[in-house]
Amino acid sequence: MAFPGAGPILGAIAVSSCLYFLFDYVPIPRWWDKNAYLIGQMHPDEITGLECPYAYLRQIYGKYHWAPFVHKISPTLQKDDYPKYVMVLEIMDAIHLCLMLVDDISDGSDYRKGKPAAHKIYGPTETANRAYYRVTQILAQTTKEFPNLAPWLMGDLRDILEGQDMSLVWRRDGIGGFPTAAKDRAAAYRKMASLKTGALFRLLGHLVLENDSMDEVFTVIAWYSQLQNDCKNVYSSEYAKLKGLVAEDLHNREMTYPIVLALDAPEGHWVTRALESPSPRNIRNALKVIRSKYVRDKCTAELAESGASVKEWLQLWGRTEKLDLKA
């Protein structure tokens, strides 16, 4: 005997049973799982040919990419003390590349030198952990095999991370956590750059020479490198293609030298607005200020002044992207 309305009820029960089975027995597809981004892609070695994110980034930059600097500092080190020569290059690769791995995660970068950023393939959790693991390995190896280099490495690594922390705090707290006077802003940014980037370059001199006699030179080289990188981020179309985004720093509300100068330029309130709320409109108007002749000329003058005394060193760095984007 059929009961009126039984059909819809039985249908609902059947649908509910099917849904229960699907949700209880069938795993969530990887592409739909919110944790998949953190985990990374399965079998990344089939994509890159390499199982490790550090090895992947090292392949992009090339092994021992600091070698030209080592040869200029000490032309005979490779012959006189080959184990130390190799160790210095291993340390520089490890510290520099591992900082990049974590930096790309912090910035949410999609690309590094035109290639997918490591965390986009291996996942941010594994990429960050591998970076910490590699740095720990190199610290342990240095302490055991070259104990005389360990204090230099530890001190400079501390300074690098202090500078990075300053930059991240500014990004977190926004313009309210940054000095208000133009002179103080520039000084604060230079201090951060001297720690984050300067300590990396000074580390090379400390490791090779085991003294601080090259500190002044490497601080200048580092400042030029930081300034050049800051300028490329907002003025270079080639760099934008490699990063996959124009003005990535501004989108990330990160302080850079052009942005710091633009805060006190005519119409600088647009830069403040973009740092507080990076909407497309605010970003667009802020870029007009950052790319204005006023800011661009100041950046160009600073590049020329800081690079004048270290031209031979800068040729070794080999960065040639053109600053072709204007307001």
Swiss-Prot record:
- The entry marks the following residues as binding Mg(2+) 2, namely 103, 107
What residue ranges are annotated as transmembrane?
Answer: 3-23
CDD domains hit by this protein:
Trans_IPPS (cd00867)
UniProt-recorded Gene Ontology molecular function terms:
metal ion binding; prenyltransferase activity
Compartment(s): Membrane
SUPFAM superfamilies listed in its UniProt record: Terpenoid synthases
Q: Name one GO cellular component term.
A: membrane
Give the record's GO biological process terms: alcohol biosynthetic process; isoprenoid biosynthetic process; mycotoxin biosynthetic process
The record, for InterPro entries, names:
Isoprenoid_synthase_dom_sf, Polyprenyl_synt
What single Pfam family name could you report for this chain, choosing any that match? polyprenyl_synt
Identify the main location.
Answer: membrane
Q: Does the keyword Glycoprotein apply?
A: yes
EC class of the enzyme, as a word: transferase
Q: Which domain of life is it from?
A: Eukaryota
Where, in this chain's numbering, is Mg(2+) 1 bound?
103, 107
Q: What is its EC number?
A: 2.5.1.-
Residues that bind dimethylallyl diphosphate, according to the entry?
A: 112, 196
Residues with an annotated glycan are 211
Instruction: Name its pathway.
Output: Secondary metabolite biosynthesis
According to its UniProt record, which protein family does this protein belong to?
Answer: Belongs to the FPP/GGPP synthase family.
Q: What is this protein called?
A: Prenyl transferase janC
Q: Which organism is it from?
A: Penicillium janthinellum (Penicillium vitale)
Give the gene symbol.
janC
